């Protein structure tokens, strides 16, 4: 059992030190000096090696690990940015060869240069990647991400719904997005304790200064309120040294508070050399001698965010106050009507039981559609109908029934299981639209279909199935040309076909079915 797995299993508080690999001997030397300490205040130390934080051309986590002169306990990251299933399987084999068995799986933030409508960029979604990895490596320690720092109901509730899917898909622990709102930290912990099988939570932290706050404005999903920026600016006005000292003291205080709340550990970002590490350790030693309960901690945390002449800090964006459990929103009449119309059409044409559906199924499974020209014509017909109406990209295996008729391809990342962590007040990370998963949440809530958002684990789309009609395989799964169902763990295709052939008809959607650069942290759903 690995050090991190041991610590989580034994309920030992753990410190995960984030390292973003760059081709710099100084950075590697600094990391090795920190990791040589092996502990932070007696807590076991593990390095987390980031993946594609800046660009796909960054040094890979495996190459970075291999570059270390001394082997250290390591948690590698896998980012789904511009990746397919095969890329993940290759990394698993390479990790086997290196003797590594711990992986933090992320969908990833926006790939630099990715512009919707230009070159398609695929993101291997974390839920599907977790399924693939869990089935391929059942004994590995797998983590995923959760961003609880959401202040509108749609994006916040959808985050927790997707987190439930991640647990079902095989996550052993969740690492939170970087954040400073202690009420949101407690909210996430209370949510986890209500799950059927609670898992450990690790909080991502960074010592926050005015300069870093400005940088975080460009990090998807990170929240630094105007109130926080005012206080950080006031600290800098005193002196840079004063601001730096306050940031380290706050970081130490936050670590202590999270430990008292019941977090399994912390994921520390932005500590780049031994001097910073030692300064944090000294601050922790001092404050541990003074603070022993949450009742003692809360006023100390509030005081750490006070400056003369400024009001008390508020961590939430102005006018946005949602907390888990609050129910305020509903789908518009248009959104509800759209769902009911499309659900009705689906029942007529695709439920496989009424005469119209059987006739349509017979028509689209004729041998003529398996010729090159026939397949091309059928693909063009389906695309011409569904793309203007739904944003469809003819992925070859239609998932509309599982997504309340809101096409996953209308998300710039193509995410089907729920939102990434990069939304801001319901706005997509790309900034050009409302997050489609916020619309999906409102719709599900209004039509009593929220179970769909937690129970249906939607596999990724295999590359060979893209840009062909989904209709023939909907009615006759034996017609599929996909080499292996994504997330199958490599089950032979003939078995998958046999299961599909003998499975009962798929229910209507009326019924739920169980089941850039410059980034200090890459935690994203």
Regions found by a protein language model. Name each.
Residues 15-21, 45-49, 74-78, 103-105, ...:
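Hydrophobic faces of well-ordered beta-strands that scaffold small-molecule active sites
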Residues 13-30, 74-86, 143-158, 234-249:
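Active-site mouth loops of central-metabolism enzymes
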Residues 55, 378-504:
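Metallocofactor- and cofactor-centric catalytic cores in central/energy metabolism, strongly enriched
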Residues 5-9, 26, 33, 108, ...:
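Active-site pocket-lining/capping segments in soluble small-molecule metabolic enzymes
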Residues 186-198, 211-213, 249-365, 369-383, ...:
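Structured C-terminal cap/extension of enzyme domains
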Residues 1-46:
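Conserved N-terminal beta1-alpha1 strand-loop-helix module at the mouth
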């Amino acid at each position: 059992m690995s050090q991190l797995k041991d610590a989580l299993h034994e309920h030992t508080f753990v410190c995960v030190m984030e390292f973003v690999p760059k081709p710099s001997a100084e950075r590697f030397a600094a990391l090795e000096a920190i990791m040589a300490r092996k502990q932070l205040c007696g807590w076991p130390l593990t390095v987390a090696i980031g993946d594609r934080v800046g660009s796909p051309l960054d040094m890979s986590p495996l190459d970075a690990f291999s570059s270390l002169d001394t082997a250290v306990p390591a948690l590698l990251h896998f980012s789904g940015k511009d990746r397919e299933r095969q890329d993940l399987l290759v990394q698993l084999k390479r990790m086997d060869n290196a003797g590594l068995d711990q992986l933090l799986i992320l969908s990833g933030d926006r790939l630099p240069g990715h512009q919707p409508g230009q070159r398609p960029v695929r993101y291997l979604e974390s839920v599907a990647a977790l399924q693939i990895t869990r089935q391929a490596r059942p004994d590995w320690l797998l983590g995923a991400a959760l961003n609880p720092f959401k202040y509108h109901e749609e994006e916040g509730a959808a985050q927790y719904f997707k987190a439930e899917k991640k647990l079902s898909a095989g996550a052993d622990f969740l690492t939170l997005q970087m954040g400073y709102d202690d009420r949101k930290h407690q909210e996430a912990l209370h949510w986890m304790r209500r799950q059927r099988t609670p898992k450990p939570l690790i909080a991502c932290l960074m010592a926050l200064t005015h300069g870093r706050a400005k940088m975080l404005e460009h990090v998807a999903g990170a929240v630094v309120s105007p109130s926080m920026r005012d206080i950080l600016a006031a600290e800098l006005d005193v002196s840079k040294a004063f601001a730096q000292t306050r940031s380290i003291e706050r970081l130490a205080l936050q670590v202590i508070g999270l430990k008292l709340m019941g977090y399994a550990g912390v994921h520390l970002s932005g500590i780049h050399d031994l001097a910073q590490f030692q300064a944090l350790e000294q601050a922790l030693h001092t404050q541990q001698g003074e603070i022993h309960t949450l009742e003692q901690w809360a006023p100390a945390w509030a005081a750490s965010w006070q400056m003369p002449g400024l009001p008390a800090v508020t961590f939430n964006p102005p006018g946005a106050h949602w907390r888990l459990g609050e129910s305020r929103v509903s789908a518009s009449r248009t959104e509800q009507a759209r769902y009911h119309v499309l659900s009705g059409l689906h029942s007529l044409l695709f439920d496989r039981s009424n005469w119209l559906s059987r006739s349509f199924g017979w028509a689209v499974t004729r041998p003529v559609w398996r010729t090159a020209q026939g397949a091309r014509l059928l693909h063009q017909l389906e695309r011409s109908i569904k793309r203007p109406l739904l944003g469809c990209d003819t992925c070859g295996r239609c998932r509309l029934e599982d997504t309340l008729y809101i096409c996953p391809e209308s998300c710039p990342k193509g995410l089907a299981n729920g939102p990434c962590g990069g939304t801001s007040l319901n706005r997509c990370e790309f900034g050009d639209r409302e997050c489609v998963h916020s619309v999906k949440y409102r719709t599900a809530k209004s039509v009593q279909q929220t179970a769909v958002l937690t129970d249906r684990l939607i596999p990724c789309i295999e590359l060979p199935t893209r840009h062909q009609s989904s209709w023939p395989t909907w009615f006759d799964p034996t017609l599929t040309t996909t080499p292996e169902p994504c997330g199958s763990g490599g089950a032979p295709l003939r078995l998958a076909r046999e299961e599909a052939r003998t499975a009962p008809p798929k229910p209507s959607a009326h019924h739920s079915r169980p089941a850039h650069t410059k980034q200090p942290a890459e935690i994203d759903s």
